Amino acid sequence: MPKPINVRVTTMDAELEFAIQPNTTGKQLFDQVVKTIGLREVWYFGLQYVDNKGFPTWLKLDKKVSAQEVRKENPVQFKFRAKFYPEDVAEELIQDITQKLFFLQVKDGILSDEIYCPPETAVLLGSYAVQAKFGDYNKEMHKSGYLSSERLIPQRVMDQHKLSRDQWEDRIQVWHAEHRGMLKDSAMLEYLKIAQDLEMYGINYFEIKNKKGTDLWLGVDALGLNIYEKDDKLTPKIGFPWSEIRNISFNDKKFVIKPIDKKAPDFVFYAPRLRINKRILQLCMGNHELYMRRRKPDTIEVQQMKAQAREEKHQKQLERQQLETEKKRRETVEREKEQMLREKEELMLRLQDYEQKTKRAEKELSEQIEKALQLEEERRRAQEEAERLEADRMAALRAKEELERQAQDQIKSQEQLAAELAEYTAKIALLEEARRRKEDEVEEWQHRAKEAQDDLVKTKEELHLVMTAPPPPPPPVYEPVNYHVQEGLQDEGAEPMGYSAELSSEGILDDRNEEKRITEAEKNERVQRQLLTLSNELSQARDENKRTHNDIIHNENMRQGRDKYKTLRQIRQGNTKQRIDEFEAM
């Protein structure tokens, strides 16, 4: 029995190991990988390996794995990577797993500087990457340093600014907090929506020469072929959409593209190696097929995938809403519980205050009772004294009357009678005055006793109100709350040094609608505002002496108001012949 071949496939976030038979084809291995990870949008992806000469190569699906130029190692190493890119991630990517794989691959390309990204965009993308990994920022959970082990922004950007690692993390943390409420899957999609507007996103670059021998770059992407000057990979100079191309072929190092416009000459360039032309042809055929497929009605399978994805997304939204509702309910219960505890404490304090007031009222009542008794005693003594004085007065009156009678009965001298009469009259006047004062005093004591009695009654009423008030309510009791492109070049060709492929453009709808696109920053005011704020912040710490060649080109494009899609419209102006003539003249 043939000995199995051990294979290790590395995706962007996992390592898979398989044992395959010597007669296993590339498609069988590919199908095993996508089945394992649950991927249905297989047309974007391929298996990449480093061949015997050290060049990165895509595994041919129609050939046996063992018959291809894979290195003889154990296990045989492959990378599962995106080979083709969508035009618009938001419109085309269906499954969450597809979004995640693109997100991780694009992020890796930006962090390694394979895709140029300006500083302010790099920081904003870094914050979306943090949201995609950690979810909502929580200051209790995400303590200082929680980003210390994360790759956040390209090293180039860090080197260009006078900011420490902590200062970079602080900036990203602030923007992380801005994304509160955004799902992790949504954060990945937002990342890709911004990243797809970067000039180098989704482009495969190849060194070529025109007939004059000028060194140039050929860029192959989802929208067509673009020509770049050797020192500028950001700004294409000439563009050809896939809908303008009817045939592509190569013979040895010569590559020929035949336009649909029969008045236009062939578009010819030269690659340094035959294997580069093979790769260019594969990418052209695959990207052209996807370009045409996107401009035709969806197949039943794609419609079903989209419907399933919508249902899954809807279900996730419902689950999210339920979680948010439950979270808010718990927060409400916690707030109510805290409020009840505060009210309980307030009631206890009020009860203590009532008790203290009661004790004071009882003490005051006791003092007032004692004072009332004292006043009553004083009144009684004053009454007795008034009665005694009244008795003395009456006695004096009687004596006076007796004297008067005696004066009538006896003959006394006028002087003696007058003297006695004057004496008793004076005494009577004194007694009258004393009696009047005592009556006033008695009246005063009676008034004070009445006031004391009124105070006593009032105090008793207050005490009765305190003692009969309903007790504070007891604290509440809480219950515990809880989806291929059919491979372009299946064979390297019936002829060993050449290959030709016809590219059909029939039946497509709105073949150049990509020229109407605008960047995410232009259509999204929030992203535009965030990028402007970040640009202003970073400009204060930027070391202008460390700007790279790409930085200078990007800044000049920005200064002239150019972006990826405005440049695309510009480089496709004129007819095909004019653009081919421009290419030949470069």
Swiss-Prot record:
Interaction with SCYL3: annotated span: 244-586
Tissue specificity note: Detected in eye lens fiber cells. Expressed in cerebrum and cerebellum (at protein level). Component of the microvilli of intestinal epithelial cells.
Subcellular location: Apical cell membrane; Cell projection; Cell projection, Microvillus membrane; Cell projection, Ruffle membrane
PROSITE patterns documented for this protein: FERM_1 (PS00660), FERM_2 (PS00661), FERM_3 (PS50057)
Example of a GO cellular component annotation carried by this entry: protein-containing complex
Keyword flag Phosphoprotein: yes
InterPro entries, per database record: Band_41_domain, ERM, ERM_C_dom, ERM_FERM_C, ERM_helical, Ez/rad/moesin-like, FERM/acyl-CoA-bd_prot_sf, FERM_2
Signal peptide residues on this chain, from the entry's feature table: none
Residue(s) carrying N6-acetyllysine: 60
GO terms of molecular function: actin filament binding; ATPase binding; cell adhesion molecule binding; disordered domain specific binding; identical protein binding; microtubule binding; protein kinase A catalytic subunit binding; protein kinase A regulatory subunit binding
Domain FERM: 2-295
Chain spans, region Disordered: 306-338, 534-565
Keyword entries, A-Z: Acetylation, Cell membrane, Cell projection, Cell shape, Coiled coil, Cytoplasm, Cytoskeleton, Membrane, Phosphoprotein, S-nitrosylation
Residues found modified as Phosphothreonine: 567
Biased composition (Basic and acidic residues): 308-338, 540-565
Coiled coil location: 302-462
Topology in membrane: Peripheral membrane protein
Domain comment (free text): Has three main structural domains: an N-terminal FERM domain, a central alpha-helical domain and a C-terminal actin-binding domain. The FERM domain is organized in a clover-shaped structure that comprises three subdomains identified as F1 (residues 2-82), F2 (residues 96-198), and F3 (residues 204-296). In the active form, the subdomain F3 adopts two mutually exclusive conformational isomers where a row of four phenylalanine side chains (Phe250, Phe255, Phe267 and Phe269) must point in the same direction. In the autoinhibited form, the F3 subdomain interacts with the C-terminal domain (residues 516-586) and stabilizes the structure, selecting only one possible arrangement of phenylalanine side chains.
Name used for this protein in its record: Ezrin
Biological source species: Mus musculus (Mouse)
Gene (UniProt): Ezr
